[in-house]
Amino acid sequence: TGGGKTMCMIEDVKRQFKSPVSKTIVVVAPRILLANQLCSEFLEQNLDGNYNVGVDVIHVHSGETHFYSTTKSDNIKKWYHNSTKHIIMFTTYHSLHKIQDTLDVEVDTIYFDESHNAVQKNFIEAVEYYSIYASRCYFFTATPKHSLTPFKVGMNDADIFGQVICNVPAPKLVKQGYILPPKVVINKIDLPDDDRFAYEHDRDCVLDTIDAQDVDKILICARSTKQIINLVTHSTFVVDLISRGYSWMMITSKTGAVIDGKKVDREEFFNTLNSWGKDSSKRFVVLHHSILSEGINVKGLEAAMFLRNMDYITISQTIGRVIRKGDESKTFGLLCVPVYD
């Protein structure tokens, strides 16, 4: 959400890497795209005081990266024992157990980013393991998930998640100028009729909103991958966007990343997304289902448009994509909500 959670981790890593004894840091993210983004943001900083010459990096997930990447416990163990430097491991909640399975990796500090994901039953075993056995363990989220029953894990379980060290309300971040206030706009649309395909109605809904709000950089949250594919392949949506001066990109776990009709790897997608976000003259639309909701930092993103229902955490995370500060002309994050007239 732009509150500075990542910088808290980075500054702590800098303090850890001042030690003459090699330290092992693990950074956990909910998605591969965010793990790669965190790696980029960490290594932009001078972590070890020697421009990261004394730092080894490994990714433990199935995604693409320039760094050594593996999900095999034996390979992790071999790489770990061959390193004589400070170590940072970037992984996902899905793959964290792969590090746990090595048994040899002694974790000095572990950071759980978007840690509301940690309470999921298929992740909690590995999370609890490192809560006990890592020397230092920290959880970061803008949307904590609590439980009122002892039969379901929540972040209010102090035995696993500890006590709250710092809690900064969003209004305080807005007041102090770290993030922008959100602005909700209701866009009334006609009820769909049986004479037209659903994707034609979706096209009109999106284009009417774009025309009405006149924003340059828009995130569209679709109901499903199928809705996105139908919109860009079966309707005139892409042609209509181009005629308005917009580029387009989409990313889902099923289709991968696409920029202006060309399939690209996730790293190129992420780099292009940030490059376009920084370019004040660039107009573009990003379509996704949920992959960009959590933690992804896109500079300059002005508006989010909802085409589906969401739980409060996903809504809050999506709002966080557009309330980050941009240039001086951006004074709020726009949230476009279509409703039937």
Language model features with spans:
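Conserved interdomain linker/interface between the two RecA-like ATPase lobes of SF2 helicase motors
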Residues: 162-229, 234
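Conserved Walker A/P-loop ATP-binding site and its immediately adjacent core
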Residues: 8, 21-46, 223-226
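Walker A/P-loop
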Residues: 1-12
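Conserved helix-turn-beta segment of the N-terminal RecA-like "Helicase ATP-binding" lobe
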Residues: 33-70
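Post-DEXD/H (motif II) to motif III coupling segment of the RecA-like Helicase ATP-binding lobe
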Residues: 117-179
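Conserved RecA-like P-loop NTPase helicase motor core
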Residues: 117, 253-341
